[in-house]
Curated annotation (Swiss-Prot):
Class of the enzyme per the UniProt entry, highest EC level: hydrolase
GO CC term (a single one): cytoplasm
Gene Ontology MF: a single term: tRNA-specific adenosine deaminase activity
EC number: 3.5.4.33
Annotated gene: TAD2
Record-linked Pfam families: MafB19-deam
Traits of the deletion mutant: Embryonic lethality due to embryo development arrest at the globular stage.
Subcellular location: Nucleus; Cytoplasm
UniProt-recorded name of the protein: tRNA-specific adenosine deaminase TAD2
Organism: Arabidopsis thaliana (Mouse-ear cress)
Catalytic activity, as annotated: adenosine(34) in tRNA + H2O + H(+) = inosine(34) in tRNA + NH4(+)
């Protein structure tokens, strides 16, 4: 990766990590993301599965819905929305899960950069490689995907989350540890 691109990648991932920290503060799994168009952040998202009581409200889905809503409000047709997604780049703190990786493929996103791998549900190489696209993936398109950007920072947030416990986990669950907010 070129030096300027590397610096930009760290800046964009920093924005995604900020979203992940907001998720952590809200007692959500700390995943955050930002979508870019022409090098500008146009949407951001964080996990909201507990808050919404909806297991599909991952950071990527939150940001995708934000973009689709804005573009529909702007009067863009479905083909224009598809064209916009084909020019977008996503930075996300953790490898997209199978659901999100599939959605990104369906939307035809250009590129995805992520922090740490998702060894349980990863859809960009850890479990499945949905970013490669295939004839079997109906209407799915391939996209460039690269991981390992600020992975230690992303893993650190996960450690904080799992050390404090998840009060929204099904019972019985281990006790929640109260920690000071910083």
């Amino acid at each position: 990766m070129e030096e300027d691109h590397c610096e930009d990648s760290h800046n964009y991932m920093g924005f995604a990590l900020h979203q992940a920290k907001l998720a952590l503060e809200a007692l959500e799994v700390p995943v955050g993301c930002v979508f870019l168009e022409d090098g500008k952040v146009i949407a951001s998202g964080r996990n909201r599965t507990n808050e919404t009581r909806n297991a599909t409200r991952h950071a990527e889905m939150e940001a995708i819905d934000q973009l689709v809503g804005q573009w529909q409000k702007d009067g863009l047709s479905p083909s224009q929305v598809a064209e916009k997604f084909s020019k977008c780049v996503l930075y996300v703190t953790c490898e997209p899960c199978i659901m999100c990786a599939s959605a990104l493929s369906f939307l035809g996103i250009k590129e995805v950069y992520y922090g740490c791998p998702n060894d349980k549900f990863g859809g960009c190489g850890s479990i499945l490689s949905l970013h490669l696209g295939s004839e079997e993936a109906q209407r799915g398109k391939g996209y460039k995907c690269r991981g390992g950007i600020m992975a230690e920072e992303a893993v650190s947030l996960f450690k904080c989350f799992y050390e404090q416990g998840n009060p929204n986990a099904p019972k019985p669950h281990r006790p929640v540890v109260q920690r000071e907010r910083t």
